[in-house]
Amino acid sequence: MHRSIFLACLALAACAAGGVADPFYVHVNPSLRTAYHSRARIVEDRPMLMTLTRAGFDTKNVGDFGKVGFWNWTVSSLTDRRATRHRHALNEMDYGVFWTYVWDFGRLDDTWRGWGLTTDVMKDWLTFEGYSHPARLAKTNASISEWRLAQSLDNPYLTPFYLVRRGLHPHDWLYVQTGVRRVFALTDTLSLTPLFFAECGSENHFERRYGAKPGGGRYRSGLMALNLSLELAWRVSDAATLYAGVHQFGIAHDDARARVKANPAPNARRDLTIGTVGVRFRF
């Protein structure tokens, strides 16, 4: 029921955006990835199709309140492997609402032009109804409810950022991602973006992602994994940008690495290089 309401609102926003470019907008980002990385873990080590859609309303015409809207994230597998575990298309569908606000430091003084603080607050529901695994059939595991808070200090030099995700139901956990990125303009339409980030988590989050600690006891909250990525983007037009990237993932916690190494599952990877190609549409 909640998903149907969300998708209906998303479609309505898309139609509005098609007729009135301002203040409504829709961003759609389909991408092909050689693996699926999420919250310090390789969830799938096979090709996946992922699509992120954000439909929103910019309040700038009625007041300086930022942007509000809906978002949707879908995951589909592109191979037959693990077909007994979940269906191919839309085996995961996440959705939620968001509020985004950009504080432009240039308002204070021209010296700060190009600097700003972007804040993104989201309420999410992650659903896994395409799974046939017994753990996913239990009602308490049918979906995950969480909050997200993300901020970045945008500037022409090196942009630091962080993301906090708090799991509420059915499990209580805390995940923190923090890093830096830099966009290098190669030409008017071509850019290169290196990005580095660390992933940290609470004790409960360690157990949810990796399983019980080897030898018993509990994990300590702290660093989980390190990531380095490089993206090359080509802006074809104001409405479309093509991009390709490579992402190196590695678990940084010794006990977690030992636990994953002992896991016989084919997607239990301690380190992995992930390739991505995609397109970003803005309407």
Describe these PLM feature segments.
Residues 5-11, 107, 157, 189:
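Acidic/proline-rich low-complexity IDRs
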Residues 12, 19-21, 44, 61, ...:
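Sterically constrained small-residue positions within well-ordered secondary structures
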Residues 27, 43, 72-179, 258-270:
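Outer-membrane pore/translocation modules
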Residues 1, 5, 10, 119, ...:
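Compositionally biased regions
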Residues 21, 28-35, 72-77, 154-163, ...:
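Flexible, solvent-exposed coil segments and beta strand-coil junctions
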Residues 1-25:
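Cleavable N-terminal export/targeting peptides
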Residues 18-84, 274, 280-282:
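Short glycine/proline- and aromatic-enriched beta-strand/turn motifs that initiate or cap beta-hairpins
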Residues 52, 57-64, 101-107, 153, ...:
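Outer-membrane beta-barrel transmembrane domain signature
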